[in-house]
From Swiss-Prot:
One of its GO terms (cellular component) is respiratory chain complex III. PANTHER family: CYTOCHROME B. Pfam families: Cytochrom_B_C, Cytochrome_B. The keyword Metal-binding applies. It is a multi-pass membrane protein. GO terms for biological process: mitochondrial electron transport, ubiquinol to cytochrome c. Its cofactor is heme b. It comes from Cephalophorus callipygus. This is Cytochrome b. The chain crosses the membrane at residues 33-53, 77-98, 113-133, 178-198, 226-246, 288-308, 320-340, 347-367.
Amino acid sequence: MTNIRKTHPLLKIVNNAFIDLPAPSNISSWWNFGSLLGICLILQILTGLFLAMHYTADTTTAFSSVTHICRDVNYGWIIRYMHANGASMFFICLFMHVGRGLYYGSYTYMETWNIGVILLFATMATAFMGYVLPWGQMSFWGATVITNLLSAIPYIGTNLVEWIWGGFSVDKATLTRFFAFHFIFPFIIAALAMVHLLFLHETGSNNPTGISSDADKIPFHPYYTIKDILGALLLILVLMTLVLFSPDLLGDPDNYTPANPLNTPPHIKPEWYFLFAYAILRSIPNKLGGVLALVLSILILVLMPLLHTSKQRSMMFRPISQCLFWILVADLLTLTWIGGQPVEHPYIIIGQLASIMYFLLILVLMPMASTIENNLLKW
C-alpha cells in the first residue's frame, strides 16, 4: 500500500514540497535563508498576535500599553523584544537571501524573483508600520517624514498624504490604520511566500555552479531538513542572545520618549535595515529625485535578469564579477553607516559618492564585467 503522505490530498502537497522534493546535492548554507525567513515570519506572527492582545491602537494609550506589556504582562518583555529583534533577524536573512540570489544568478527564475521583490517591498512596508505603533518620538517623526515623501508626487501628492494620514497630520486615525495594516500584512506575506515557493518548485532550486543539477538530485528529507534545523537553531541562538543580553542594541533611545508633535528629535532616522535606502534618499537635494532614487534602489532588483550579460549564470567562476559584487556589499554597508549619521560634512559627500557607486555598479560596471569575462572565455 502506498504511503499516506503520497496519497492524501493535503499531505501530498507537503510531501512534494518538503519531503520527497528532488534537491540539488551541492547547495550550500546560502540556501538556508529561505527556510529561516519562513521561521522568522511564523515567529513574528505568533509574537505579534500575543502583543496585539495587550496593545491599544490609540494615541493616548499606545505608549502606555507597550510599557504595560513590558512591566505587567507575564513574559511580555520577552515577547516584545523577540518581536522587535525578530524584525532585525528577518531583514538580515532577507538581505542574505537576496545577496545569494544576486551572486548565484537565481534571478533568472523570473517569476520566483519578481514575487521575491514584491515580498521584500511588503516586508519593508510592514516593518515601517510596525515601528510607528509604540508611539515613541522616533515612531511619530519617522511616520511623519516617510509618509510626507509621497507629497513629492506631482499633482496628487498632497491629497495622497492627507488621505494616508486620515487628517492633516499623523494622528489617531493614522495609528489605528497602521495597526490594522500591520496586522493583516504578515498574512499577505505568508500567502505570497507560498506563491514564491510554488514558482520555485516549478523549476527546482538553483545551485552554486549555476549549471543544471537534474543529473544529481537528492531527496529534501532527511538531508536538507536536518540542515535547515541546524540553521534554525543558529538563528534562534543569535536572536535570543540579542533579546536576553542587549535587547535595545538596534533600537533608538528616542523611542523611549512618548510621541510629541511639538518637539522634533535632532536626528530623525529609521531602523537600521532601512538606513541604506534612507542614505540614498538624503543624498539627492531634490525631493522628488530623492523619492525616485529611494524607490529605484529596491526596484532595480527587477531589472537584474535584463542586466545579466554573462554566458554563465553563477558568479562562481567569474572573478571580476565577484570583486564587483563584494564592492557592492561594502557600498551598501557604507550607505547603512551614512544613513545613521547627521547631515553634515563629510557625511553628505560620502553618501552621495556611495549612492552614485551603488547605481553605477549595478547598471554599468557589473554588466560590463560580464561582457569582458565572456570575451576572456575565448582566449
